[in-house]
């Protein structure tokens, strides 16, 4: 099962359109956030646990209909939705096998009251994101953490060694993998990357491979795409 959370002022249908995650051999859930937002952001109307309860309710309903593998439930999301994916991975690690935030907004509330239980994590972010800066900043009068800060926290939580391996995956992006972790931790740094789901139809940069973020997220989750005939 993959939960895919849309960005602020977006909706589930748009997330489905640009992510193409339903090409995966998995049950993909595209929820709609109340007022087009998700918990953890200062503008969300669901702060206080409402969206986490919503996710749990969806899972309960799914298990009554489908033979859900409870050890293979994952979450990803874009921007505010990426921050929410990080939040539920932080606070509900026993439910999720892994998370993959993309261009995520890591407001301070995202990492409040984190469990000490490790969770597999892949972060994807563009270095020139003008909306949610790679180096952190302030939006809606609220501070959000930088990508390096978030990865440092995740490395401690997953008990990773300081050593990492970095290699180029294409002309626009590098991948960094931490060593010795209890559960995997990886980061894809998109050079000159904008605020987008990298490789989506609306990402017009020629140096970013088509469906790059989707392919990397599914690879990290260990999920293959449905074969095309």
What role is predicted for each listed range?
Residues 1-74, 78, 83-87, 91, ...:
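Serine-hydrolase catalytic machinery in alpha/beta-hydrolase-like enzymes
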Residues 124, 145, 157-229:
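C-terminal catalytic histidine-bearing segment of alpha/beta-hydrolase fold enzymes
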Residues 13-20, 105-113, 170-176:
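Alpha-helical scaffolding within the catalytic cores
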Residues 123-125, 129:
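Short beta-strand/loop motif that positions the catalytic acidic residue
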Residues 129-132, 195-196:
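Acidic catalytic loop of the alpha/beta-hydrolase fold
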Residues 71-119, 130:
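Primarily recognizes the serine-hydrolase "nucleophile elbow" in alpha/beta-hydrolase
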Residues 20-24, 67-68, 91-94, 113-117, ...:
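Extracellular/periplasmic catalytic domains that process cell-envelope and extracellular macromolecules
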Residues 32-36, 105, 193:
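Short beta-to-alpha linker loops that shape the active-site pocket of alpha/beta-hydrolase fold enzymes
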